[in-house]
Amino acid sequence: MDYLEGLNDKQREAVTYGEGPLLILAGAGSGKTRVLTHRIAYLIEERGVLPYNILAITFTNKAANEMKERVGNLLGNKIDDLWIGTFHSTCVRILRRNIDKLGYSSNFVIYDSYDQKSVVKECIKELNLDKETYKERSILSTISSLKNTMVTPDEYINENYGNFYNRNVGELYALYEKKLKNNNGLDFDDLLLKT
């Protein structure tokens, strides 16, 4: 199969590009996914790259499924070992193989927003904090921000020791993390952070 058929000059150039990083800037509907899928097929068929050495990450499940389908149309059954998915699904795949190194088992549970709110509600009750002052949504937003900036509960508590409210938020964060760990659970931020 000719993996360059139907591509314009710039697309062909991207598909056959040598080694190293390549940044493609193009607007919606310009053929970026087409270039990526043809590049994957080209690397496997023409350059001998093993499928499990290719990682293609998208933002949405829809885009990931579309990419898998397109690569499948080009390569047939050679896509089983390809890593095509969203950031989170790729992280789950990596963690299922390696999370034991972090003290979790591979059958960890992923907490959705409802589960997270339930855990925070338990934490607020356990720490005897006022549920009107410490709202689940606000606490979860803070925990998410802290995780995304790689601030641990202890660091946050130490940084905010003189601030009663923030110190309590830090205590909530610490208890939240403990409860997730005790239940072999991860939230969506953990999927990225722990990978």
Task: Annotate each PLM feature.
Residues 1, 19-22, 41-195:
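A basic/glycine-biased coupling hinge at the interface between accessory DNA-binding modules
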Residues 5, 34, 57:
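Active-site alpha-helix of zinc metalloproteases
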Residues 5-16:
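Pre-Walker A adenine-sensing motif
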Residues 8, 37, 189:
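Glycine-rich phosphate-binding loop at the start of an alpha helix
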Residues 19-38:
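Walker A/P-loop
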